[in-house]
Amino acid sequence: MRCTLLILCTLFHFLTVSAQELTARVNINHQQVQGTDNAIFEELKEKLEEFLNAQQWTSLQFLEHERISCSFNITVKEYKREEGIWSCTCMVQANRPVYNSAYTTTIFQFQDNDFTFTYRQFENLNYNEEIIDNQLLALFAYYSYLIIGIDLDTFSLYGGSDVLNRCLNLTNNAQNSEFPGWKAYDSRKNRFAIINDYMEGAMEPFRTLQYNYYRKGLDEMANNVERGRTEISTAITENLEKAHKDRSTSMLPQIWTDYKKDEIANIYKGKGTAKEKSQVYDVLFSINPSQSNSWDLIKQ
């Protein structure tokens, strides 16, 4: 009886503890591509999901319910079958649960318009972190490291540093790539700019924001709404504002406010003091005036 119980407990442990960090979904929209066998799109989707979800990206142990939910919505703009070249865009999103609630919050969202790679039907996807000579795998390794690092940052201050440095190293090693999106200073909003800015010393307040907003703010709201909102206000008016001022050329604060706008508006609409709402509004409007409709809701 004891032997049976021990075996069951051991099996339960291996079923619930996972080395893998991600629960990823891949969607491939190929409506703009005509005259191509749909089988290759379904094949690529399945291979990418298997790659993302089976790969062990770090040495950390994640419980099954701790795996990071993320999605990659790829739109194929052009597919050159003979050369195996895919010209795409990709909307990348990652979420995390909020403590003691059924609510999930977005921790990263980005539209990558330079999502170009090569892939031929039946091609094997063999990943080697030391030598990433496959553009398709480089793209998904980049976002996997970035998502895991950001997620860890939201649970402990600078907690994602190790894995984020791996993301930065991958990007630095891709500087000679013929594919777009990797080059330093080609764009303020490409893959290089995102990870380089995120890891720059002047942007430490932005990483502090990640911890204060999510862990000290949102996670606290289930226990004490007022205290949680106060922490969020401090994160925005101190951390986010300082990051924007110290590194005014970085697009990270704007990208962050683009995908947090609805959540932030709901946190303050009809709640909080007039002074608190005014201070938060001023910071957000100065960073991203294009989202003024959302910021106006804060003052209600």
Identify what each model region corresponds to.
Residues 20-87, 98-100:
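Start-of-domain marker
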Residues 31-38, 126-134, 246:
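Second-shell loop/turn segments in exported
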Residues 49-57, 149-153, 265, 269:
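Sec-exported extracytoplasmic/periplasmic mature domains
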Residues 82-193:
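Acidic/His-rich structured neighborhood in mature extracellular/periplasmic domains
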Residues 159-249, 253:
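Flexible, glycine-rich surface segments
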